[in-house]
UniProtKB/Swiss-Prot annotation:
Major enzyme class: ligase
Binding-site residues, Zn(2+): 569, 573, 693, 697
Cofactor comment text: Binds 1 zinc ion per subunit.
Cofactor dependence: Zn(2+)
One GO term of the biological process aspect: alanyl-tRNA aminoacylation
Molecular function (Gene Ontology), one example: ATP binding
Protein name: Alanine--tRNA ligase
Organism: Roseiflexus castenholzii (strain DSM 13941 / HLO8)
Length: 905
């Protein structure tokens, strides 16, 4: 058997099928394209699902891929098994070959045999093959069995199993069929090999390849007109076999990641062998984290984002168990990028963003971990003190709600102490919180969805791309939650038409406003929504007469407002492109608001955008506006739009046919004026934006007029926000800024051109005066403190000073204490002050006494209750605080007794 690297296995697999007429198709994203049924891509066939279902036609009938996959739950994987198990993974690569109605078993099985026995040179005597044994509904797969034997397999090595192991189903409807799996025995002694080990839990039998033969329609079990083939070979397992090891973690895919961890710790191989589980978990999770972030997922609290956060945090916690105290995961993820970036270029393209995101999330979690662990330990001690074995759900909830401590980590730490967590109680508290949130939140028109769902209406035809007015027939009316035949003057009403030019709020663009004019009345429209899919509903008030069902009304959108919205929306696309060009392709849209008076754009980026970057982004957008490039749209198949380079928004669901908005992307100069041509050449970048978008846009970029960024801020970890203005609003903002500039210039007595110099001079003067004032205050304070030294007392041979002073904050109080302690030479200083309305007590002991005869921390613990508070600290310095400032003199009176108690002890 050949010994091959993982890279060689991947390449030889793909090349083998390429040479046999297959198209090498790049891996799709870990985020399934336009498939809401899947959280992550978990097999090679996911990107071809619509092709297998007959919903999509590809320009080829044979394909081969190395597909990125992620499995974190369900039958395929349990996250807690990753690390302890020698072969479980979250992220993995699936090698596959596919036939879309082209070849079938008669060609697939001989090719599989040739690849395994000739190219990979696997020993035939170690291979086993399984086929479907048949049942009452489907006959046995004798054809596959015979083909394996014809290819060269020993008939005794071809085994038959039932549906559980050898029949594949996509869903209740669609293609299905028998599958044939190839298993290899990797044990040392061939005499111990037997058929009983196949499809068992024996680790010496490794399933390396599954060939699925789609030949039936699931709902009828009738033969398909064009049967297909879908195969999957796990690269990690194949590497394990080809490299002669018994764990995937001992292959060249994981060894560099484990070695990096050991290097960071300054540890050696025996350290790894003594703690394999956490090292392996970190190695696996670093791959999953790097690839998820590269594909656009950011850590968060819901959906895919929560899965990423959970994997990342589990890696960090596992790392802590082997000695990592500072952030380390980005260093390991860097090896993933270095190791796999050539095969998956998105890793290299987004390397900086990946590593910054990992580091930011890890540091945030370490802060959470530090606070949460100490709280959890106190809970564990409390439970154990009463002989309990279960951490109450209320405590687990408090850890999550107050400290951000995840339940799974609470469970893990509890298990390490022999305890469990009341998960039912935790879920009950979580549901109570969710219920409160639902009651408190005023979700727009939330109750309306139920009312409209009860009315059977066809989809509304939207005509607003072509104009801002048109006629439509009233299909239904709702007043006060009830369906009515007529709405009269003064009533708030919801109106559905069969067709409308009014745009319903969607994709960040707010809904239109305007009027509906009927034969007997008029309604003012204040908002437009889609409470149920496909149905556009106009929300407003009947101002005159009445509006009735089946009447034809004239729909008139507020054209001035719509034009302003279109300017904002087109500018949003230009901003998105500029962000990607300036910051990197990782700067993907994470949310937006498109309104007539402003736009807001959230995007993925880990650090503040610098002023220089903001200026360059703004420059590019305005250059694009001046170039007056055309804005066009077309409807086309989803896959065709992606192949044309259109940006599809992360997490958005698209139909089979999508609307692609193109801005610029002009190859020649035919569509541009001479001035625009010059502007485009002067700008120094290609003006081309393509996005999937259902919103409304201007006809040319020049209609935007002007673009100005007014703010840049953070909205969440790894997500930034830009707010901007366009058109007249941008001009007004610029005018206001100029007016402010002139006003400030007049106040400081300098022309606007010299304002910076004048402000610097004023600040320098202010700083000099502040320094002189501080020196004066310091002299006065020292004079006051010197006076206190006359009040030094003694308890036995211990000198002490106890006094109330005035201090603006605790920092100044400590400065006073330091000065007095140094002047005292040997002794104890106790100072008290009222700061922010509360009593603050500071105790300091000189080095000759601290920790030997006097403990400052114990001293303030004795004084704090007198002022209604608590405190503590080190032997040499401690602080306490309390609410009862009136009792400060009493606390100072008690210093002598407290010192006597310590000295006497």
């Amino acid at each position: 058997m050949k010994r091959l690297s993982s890279a060689a296995i991947r390449e030889q697999f793909l090349r083998f099928f390429e040479e046999r007429g297959h198209v090498r198709v790049p891996s799709s994203s870990l985020i399934p394209g336009n498939d809401p049924t899947l959280l992550f891509t978990n097999s090679g066939m996911v990107q071809f699902k619509d092709t297998f279902l007959g919903l999509e036609q590809r320009p080829y009938t044979r394909a081969t891929t190395a597909q990125k996959c992620l499995r974190v739950s369900g039958k395929h994987n349990d996250l807690e098994e990753v690390g302890p198990s020698p072969r479980h993974h979250t992220f993995f690569e699936m090698l596959g070959n596919f036939s879309f109605g082209d070849y079938f078993k008669a060609e697939a099985i001989p090719m599989a045999w040739e690849l395994l026995t000739k190219v990979f040179d696997l020993p035939v005597e170690r291979l086993w093959f399984t086929v479907f044994e048949g049942d009452d509904e489907v006959p046995p797969d004798d054809e596959a069995a015979q083909l394996w034997v014809a290819a060269g397999a020993d008939p005794e090595r071809v085994l038959r199993f039932g549906r559980k192991d050898n029949f594949w189903v996509m869903a209740d409807a669609g293609p299905c069929g028998p599958c044939s799996e190839i298993t290899i025995f990797i044990g040392d002694d061939l005499k111990e090999m037997s058929a009983k080990g196949v499809n068992s839990d024996d680790p010496n039998y490794v399933e390396i390849w599954n060939n699925v033969f789609m030949q039936f329609e699931r709902s009828t079990m009738q033969p398909l007109h064009r049967p297909s083939v879908d195969t999957g070979m796990g690269l990690e397992r194949m590497a394990m076999v080809m490299q002669g090891v018994h764990s995937t973690y001992d292959t060249d895919l994981f060894i560099p990641l484990i070695e990096r961890q050991l290097a960071l710790l300054g540890a050696d191989e025996p350290t790894y062998r003594a703690h394999v589980a956490p090292f392996r978990a970190v190695a696996d999770h670093s791959r999953a984290v790097a690839f998820l972030i590269a594909d656009g997922v950011l850590p968060g609290n819901t959906g895919r984002s929560y899965v990423l956060r959970r994997i990342l945090r589990r890696a960090v916690y596992q790392g802590r168990t082997v000695g990592f105290e500072k952030p380390f995961l980005a260093d390991v993820a860097a090896v993933v990028i270095e190791q796999m970036g050539a095969v998956y270029p998105e890793l290299r393209e987004r390397a900086d963003f990946i590593l910054e995101t990992v580091d930011l999330e890890e540091r945030q979690f370490l802060r959470t971990l530090s606070g949460g662990v100490s709280i959890l330990k106190s809970v564990i001690e409390r439970v154990r003190a009463v002989g309990g074995t279960v951490i109450p759900g209320d405590d687990a909830f408090t850890l999550k709600d107050t400290y951000g401590f995840p339940l799974d980590l609470t469970q893990k730490i509890a298990a390490e102490h022999g305890l469990t967590v009341d998960e039912a109680g935790y879920e009950r508290r979580m549901e109570e919180q969710r219920a409160r949130g639902r009651r408190a939140a005023q979700f727009k028109r939330a109750a309306d969805a139920e009312a409209w769902a009860d009315i059977d209406l066809p989809p509304t035809r939207f005509t607003g791309y072509l104009g801002v007015s048109g006629s439509g027939t009233v299909q239904a009316l709702i007043v006060a939650g009830d369906q009515v035949a007529e709405a009269v003057a003064g009533q708030q009403v919801q109106i559905a038409l069969d067709s409308t030019p009014f745009y319903a709020e969607s994709g960040g663009q707010i809904g239109d406003t305007g009027v509906l004019i009927g034969p007997r009345g008029r309604a003012r429209i204040d908002d437009v929504q889609r409470p149920v899919p496909g149905v556009i509903v106009h929300y407003g008030v009947v101002e005159e007469g009445a509006i009735a069902v089946y009447e034809t009304v004239e729909a008139q959108v507020d054209s001035v407002r719509r034009a302003a919205i279109m300017r904002s929306h087109t500018a949003t696309h230009l901003l998105h492109r500029a962000l990607r060009d300036v910051l990197g392709e990782h700067a993907a849209q994470a949310g937006s608001l498109v309104a007539p008076d402003r736009l807001r754009f959230d995007f993925t980026h880990t650090r503040p955008v610098t002023p220089e970057q903001l200026r360059e982004i703004e420059r590019r957008v305005n250059a694009w506006i001046r170039a007056d490039t055309p804005v066009a749209w077309q409807e086309l198949p989803y896959q065709a739009a992606l192949e044309a380079g259109a940006i599809a928004l992360f997490g958005e669901k698209y139909g089979d046919v999508v609307r692609m908005v193109t801005i610029g992307c002009v190859n020649g100069n035919d569509a541009l004026s001479p001035a625009a041509i010059a502007e485009r050449q002067r700008a120094g970048f290609r003006m081309c934006s393509r996005e999937l978008c259902g919103g409304t846009h201007v006809g040319r970029s020049g209609e935007i007029g002007l673009f100005r960024i007014v703010s840049e801020s953070s909205v969440a970890a790894g997500v930034r926000r830009i707010e901007a203005l366009t058109g007249a609003e941008a001009e007004q903002w610029v005018d206001a800024q100029i007016a402010t500039l002139h006003n400030i210039a007049a106040r400081v007595g300098a022309p606007p051109s010299q304002l910076g110099e004048r402000i610097e001079a004023l600040l320098a003067e202010l700083k000099q005066r502040q320094r002189a004032l501080d020196e004066l205050h310091a002299r006065q304070a020292r004079s006051n403190l010197e006076g206190l030294l006359a009040n030094v007392q003694a308890v036995g041979d211990i000198r002490f000073l106890a006094a109330q002073v005035e201090a603006p904050d605790t920092a100044r109080l400590r400065e006073m204490g330091d000065w007095l302690r140094d002047k005292l030479g040997s002794g104890v200083v106790v100072l008290a002050a009222v700061i922010d309305g509360k009593a603050q007590i500071l105790a300091m002991a000189t080095p000759d006494l601290a920790g030997r005869r006097i403990h400052a921390g114990n001293l303030v613990k004795a004084l704090a209750p007198i002022v209604g508070g608590s405190g503590g600290g080190r032997p040499d310095m401690a602080q306490a605080g309390g609410r009862e400032v009136a009792h400060i003199p009493d606390a100072l009176e008690h210093v002598a007794a407290a010192l006597a108690a310590q000295a006497g002890g």
